[in-house]
Regions:
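Conserved "HGTGT" condensation-loop signature of ketosynthase/thiolase-family condensing enzymes
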Residues: 1-107
Length: 107
């Protein structure tokens, strides 16, 4: 069996520390925390990591459709768009059926 090689060509992230991997990295280096006091009485938590002040770009999703999708879809689109832009993979002649994306979510 032949082993297939993989390459990680771009990463994208969004969390309580920032809206992209660069912001998250820089805030982490400065010792900042993405955890804050929960002010939502419907959540049974005292502290949590909240994504604040985030608005998905109109380029990623038509403004008329934004309300149709939950916030986690907006976050996934943002992170995957960042990874694709970092990779520059869409500007190559690679077989797109050989390209994949791995997405992880933590709650």
């Amino acid at each position: 069996m032949t082993q297939r090689r993989i390459a990680i060509t771009g990463i994208g992230a969004i969390c309580g520390l920032g809206h992209n991997s660069k912001e998250i990295w820089e805030n982490g280096l400065m010792g900042r925390s993405g955890i804050s006091i929960n002010e939502n009485p419907e959540l049974p938590l005292n502290y949590a990591g909240f994504i604040k002040n985030f608005t998905l770009s109109d380029e990623l999703l038509n403004p008329k459709e934004k309300d149709r999708f939950d916030k986690f879809i907006h976050y996934a689109l943002q992170a995957s768009s960042e990874a694709l832009n970092q990779s520059n993979i869409l500007n190559t002649d690679l077989d797109r059926s050989e390209i994949g994306c791995i997405l992880g979510v933590g709650m």
